[in-house]
Amino acid sequence: MTVKSQQQIIDSFKQANQDQLFQYYDSLTIDQQQEFIDQLSTIEEPAKLISTVEQAIQFSQTNSTSRNFTQLPNEQTASTLDLSKDILQNWTELGLKAIGNGEVAVLLMAGGQGTRLGSSAPKGCFNIELPSQKSLFQIQAEKILKIEQLAQQYLKSTKKPIINWYIMTSGPTRNATESFFIENNYFGLNSHQVIFFNQGTLPCFNLQGNKILLESKNSICQSPDGNGGLYKALKDNGILDDLNSKGIKHIHMYCVDNCLVKVADPIFIGFAIAKKFDLATKVVRKRDANESVGLIVLDQDNQKPCVIEYSEISQELANKKDPQDSSKLFLRAANIVNHYYSVEFLNKMIPKWISSQKYLPFHIAKKKIPSLNLENGEFYKPTEPNGIKLEQFIFDVFPSVELNKFGCLEVDRLDEFSPLKNADGAKNDTPTTCRNHYLERSSKWVIQNGGVIDNQGLVEVDSKTSYGGEGLEFVNGKHFKNGDII
């Protein structure tokens, strides 16, 4: 970088009224100055960013409860809870065929740390104390190994297919995640099929959204750009190019904290292939009217799919029963951030999505942000919110999908969704609830196959033994005790 381009970067920030960033610039060493300029150079148009943030603050103060929401049309939805075995078999075979032909990749969101779990380690390293003591990463890696094997058997192929696993980390989790995989020999996967990349960051601002905060005299405060930053990260890190060069057509994306996730689920992939969807999402049935979850719905005003937050629907609509079945809520499709994308669709849409706030607006979160006090030059940790962090939401692009190209598959929560979010002691989503749900699912599979578990105990079906309850005929008539691993 030349001195001239350094000056251009400084000027671009000063023109955006960010003079405060350079308050200590002249006192820095040449190396520190260079480091600072390198960091600032990642922000392409400071003036545009500031104006966008100010707009986002105004937008966050408007209310969306006036919009009209309803269920998605039947043609766009299905439920594994009441589908015929023939349809499930057909979708499974379509999915296995795509996997067997090397057309499926998996995209994992693994940027989070286990802060609420009392750990600074990446969440995927967490051990929920199963009898096998396996981490979330290991369980998921072994699901990939198992589904590769099942696809090979289905196609009667001599060669095992490869599912590429793209893992999005964040600055704080990248090194620890890679080290964990190396230490564990990639859990039996080939190191070449595991590709790590980082999500982006965005600057942190004061509460008015017009000044970027300094973390030190030569660095600004930054935070991860939210799960909606995935799309830009796919482009910026060459992942989209890699998918295309490998002939990958279908992507299954999920979050690391779901201990029951069916990684590269052939039913879900087959559902999307059969119906020619560009984008599809898995949902579980909302527990009750007051469960604080986002919902997949149809915006009646523009006839587009979208996600609405719990706070965006009226109490009356939240409690409304389905006219077709009064035992169910009318709006019940709880978002679990588990999506299918066609690569062709991503190629077409990612450049649009990442170039406009129309598709991926900034959402504002007021936070306590440790930063530099410009009055005395000292670093401080505030006790009250002193600034805002920006994030983008992955589902904000849903309305850009043609309704007939958007799918929504309801699955059984007990089989497919148990997230790890809180430390033990909380009501839900703890290591204990995750462990219990995992073992209850395993035990159900064993009993369905004629196995006997003594004294109502719970057993663990190893993730390499069975992907989704198949292949367990050998347990018929056998007795197992609490804590056994099968």
Curated annotation (Swiss-Prot):
It catalyses: N-acetyl-alpha-D-glucosamine 1-phosphate + UTP + H(+) = UDP-N-acetyl-alpha-D-glucosamine + diphosphate. Its EC number is 2.7.7.23. Substrate binds at N227, K421. Its main location: cytoplasm. It is an enzyme of class 2 (transferase). Keywords: Cytoplasm, Nucleotidyltransferase, Transferase. One of its GO terms (biological process) is UDP-N-acetylglucosamine biosynthetic process. One of its GO terms (cellular component) is cytoplasm. It is found in: Cytoplasm. GO terms for molecular function: UDP-N-acetylglucosamine diphosphorylase activity. A motif (Substrate binding) lies at residues 109-112, 309-310. Pathway: Nucleotide-sugar biosynthesis; UDP-N-acetyl-alpha-D-glucosamine biosynthesis; UDP-N-acetyl-alpha-D-glucosamine from N-acetyl-alpha-D-glucosamine 1-phosphate: step 1/1. It holds the Pfam family UDPGP. UTP binds at M109, A110, G111, G112, K123, Q199, G226, D257, K389. PANTHER family: LD24639P (PTHR11952:SF2), UDP- GLUCOSE PYROPHOSPHORYLASE (PTHR11952). Belongs to the UDPGP type 1 family. This is UDP-N-acetylglucosamine pyrophosphorylase. The lineage of its organism: Eukaryota, Fungi, Dikarya, Ascomycota, Saccharomycotina. The gene is UAP1.
